[in-house]
Amino acid sequence: SKGIRKIAIVGATGKREDHTLGNISLLMEYMRSGMEVRMITDYGIFIPAQDTQTFASHPGQQVSIINFGAKGLKGKGLVYPLSDFTNWWQGTLNEAIAEEFSIYCTGEYLVFLVISDYL
């Protein structure tokens, strides 16, 4: 591994959605192996995470939280409340209300932050 612990992945979304989903799922594997990884797309950033964390944002920023088995999922600094979502779509289309937001839980989840003005 040559001591590399931080990775930014670009070009992982493209013409085939099945390949995109495969690349997104790899983010969780990289995190489990101890890597700090981000996937940068045309519209935002995917960040795999586990347990309680705080994320930089700005008021009005679109945010999605995809649960990968986290328990006790709660949020602070988001428009809509979080819960132990059982389907990926349930945590989509949220919105930050401050310069940061926090996710409180035990377990794994994936954050998507919209960085584009297109949406």
Model-found features: residue ranges?
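N-terminal glycine-rich phosphate/adenylate-binding segment common to multiple enzyme folds
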Residues: 5-16
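Class I SAM-dependent methyltransferase SAM-binding "motif I" and its flanking Rossmann-like core
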Residues: 29-57
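Long, charged alpha-helical interface segments
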Residues: 49-119
